């Protein structure tokens, strides 16, 4: 273990000088020693500048750092605890417990920088994962071992949707989950912990947080820390769920670090290594012949612009994309999933079956036609439409409302009990609407219900 000294501090970036024959490698973890608030602060090597000097990023607050402090090279990258000891615990980017429940007591640690599984180790799966959320199961079904992105601007419900998915899948799937909170609000991390505790699945979830108020180094690496824990469970032959909230903050932390390291920015001010950084993370989130990682990632869309380089780069890596729309949210329809923008590779007759495919296609066709007719209705009114178009509009409005659903995790602030709808009931309900079986029912009856049977019951009560 070689020792060096701090020679320059620029915010979260720290330059350290080592003897010429003992220069640390890129990604090695260094530790500040000596007195003061910074004792034990971990630095990660990012660049070798020559002359024995390395440029590092601080994995904590650099307040109180000064030139001349002694730094020790650990000789390996940052490592985190893995295995069952992490379940039910909240950790930071370094794998240190932050829940005041004592030491983790792990038997094994993994380094966070690891190679992605090779081609021959990867497995291809087409098994569907039922979520119990109608709009998702119908239009953009998830694959077990697949990657899903929840895209949306500020305040359209990404975190609530993710919490509902965790609630539904973690309970039904009864597998293990890892939750990586990347640059999100501490309040949400706190809410998530108590949500898991109240629903009795805390002992199946490992939580790693690098929140909004932490330095960019933490936010950049916390996703890798969470992923490393998930990889351990996968390599033991288990099926793991990896939840990342929010992938955009991971990109943003990379942008901050890149600027601090003096790299020239690329489009919209993002780091020039955006695609590579995203690829390094996403390529590791994959299923092998041993076990699977099913990942759900929230992706913040800046200014609701899906062409922004960050969400656009993320799109390429996903099997299913769930796009949340502000326009749909403004109508009071939750979950505010846009059935025309959301896509899934699984929506194929060979995977989901012909009936499911036809119903999903029919729903999208009717909604698309309604979208086209809206301008005519706004200018000329409903009376100018043909009988066929009128029927399409009435059915589309019922479909729109039937796509809404009360959530378990939202019970506290909506007052209505959550509903889990099986895929079979979802297909039956939408097929009935498309075939005109429920044309006689008022459209209000379709709003915020579970299965089609509840619609009939609600309509009968209103008579």
Curated annotation (Swiss-Prot):
- Which domain of life, per UniProt? Bacteria
The annotated topology with respect to the bilayer is: Peripheral membrane protein
Which terms in the GO cellular component ontology are assigned? plasma membrane; proton-transporting ATP synthase complex
UniProt-listed SMART domains? AAA (SM00382)
Please name one Pfam family that this protein belongs to.
ATP-synt_ab_N
Its job: Produces ATP from ADP in the presence of a proton gradient across the membrane. The catalytic sites are hosted primarily by the beta subunits.
PANTHER family recorded:
ATP SYNTHASE (PTHR15184), ATP SYNTHASE SUBUNIT BETA, MITOCHONDRIAL (PTHR15184:SF71)
Name of the protein described by the UniProt record: ATP synthase subunit beta
Q: Which organism is it from?
A: Shewanella sp. (strain W3-18-1)
**Which lineage is the organism of this entry classified under, starting from the top rank?**
Bacteria, Pseudomonadati, Pseudomonadota, Gammaproteobacteria, Alteromonadales
């Amino acid at each position: 273990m070689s020792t060096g000294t701090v020679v320059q501090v620029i915010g979260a970036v720290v330059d350290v000088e080592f003897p010429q024959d003992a220069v640390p490698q890129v990604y090695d973890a260094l530790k500040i020693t000596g007195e003061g608030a910074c004792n034990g602060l971990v630095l990660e090597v990012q660049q070798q500048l020559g002359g024995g000097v390395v440029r590092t990023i601080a994995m904590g607050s650099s307040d109180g750092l000064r030139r001349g402090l002694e730094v020790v090279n650990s000789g390996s990258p940052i490592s985190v605890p893995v295995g069952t000891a992490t379940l039910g615990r909240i950790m930071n980017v370094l794998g240190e417990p932050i829940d005041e429940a004592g030491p983790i007591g792990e038997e094994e640690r993994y380094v966070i920088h690891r190679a992605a599984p090779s081609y021959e180790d990867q497995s291809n799966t087409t098994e569907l994962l039922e979520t119990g959320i109608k709009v998702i199961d119908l239009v953009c079904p998830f694959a077990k071992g697949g990657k899903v992105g929840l895209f949306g601007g500020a305040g359209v419900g990404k975190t609530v949707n993710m919490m509902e998915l965790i609630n539904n899948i973690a309970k039904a799937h009864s597998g293990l989950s890892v939750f990586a909170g990347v640059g999100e609000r501490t309040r949400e991390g706190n809410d998530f912990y108590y949500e898991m505790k109240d629903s009795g699945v805390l002992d199946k979830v490992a939580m790693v947080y690098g929140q909004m108020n932490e330095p960019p180094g933490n936010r950049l690496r916390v996703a890798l820390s969470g992923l490393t824990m998930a990889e351990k469970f996968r390599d033991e032959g288990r099926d793991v769920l990896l939840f990342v909230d929010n992938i955009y903050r991971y990109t943003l932390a990379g942008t901050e670090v890149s600027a601090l390291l003096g790299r020239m920015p690329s489009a919209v001010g993002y780091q020039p290594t955006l695609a590579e950084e995203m690829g390094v993370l996403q390529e590791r989130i994959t299923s092998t012949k041993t076990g699977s990682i099913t990942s759900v990632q929230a992706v913040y869309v800046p200014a609701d612009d899906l062409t922004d380089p960050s969400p656009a780069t993320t799109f390429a890596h996903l099997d299913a994309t769930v796009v949340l729309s502000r326009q749909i949210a403004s109508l009071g329809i939750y979950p505010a999933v846009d059935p025309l923008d959301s896509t899934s590779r699984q929506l194929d007759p060979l995977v989901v079956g012909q009936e499911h495919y036809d119903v999903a296609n029919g729903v999208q066709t009717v909604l698309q036609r309604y979208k086209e007719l809206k301008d005519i209705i706004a200018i000329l009114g409903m009376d100018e439409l043909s009988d066929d178009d009128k029927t399409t509009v009435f059915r589309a409005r019922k479909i729109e409302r039937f796509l809404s659903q009360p959530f378990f995790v939202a019970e506290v602030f909506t007052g209505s009990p959550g509903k889990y709808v099986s895929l079979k009931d979802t297909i039956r309900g939408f097929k009935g609407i498309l075939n005109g079986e429920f044309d006689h029912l008022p459209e209000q009856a379709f709003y915020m219900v579970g299965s089609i049977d509840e619609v009939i019951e609600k309509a009968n009560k209103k008579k």
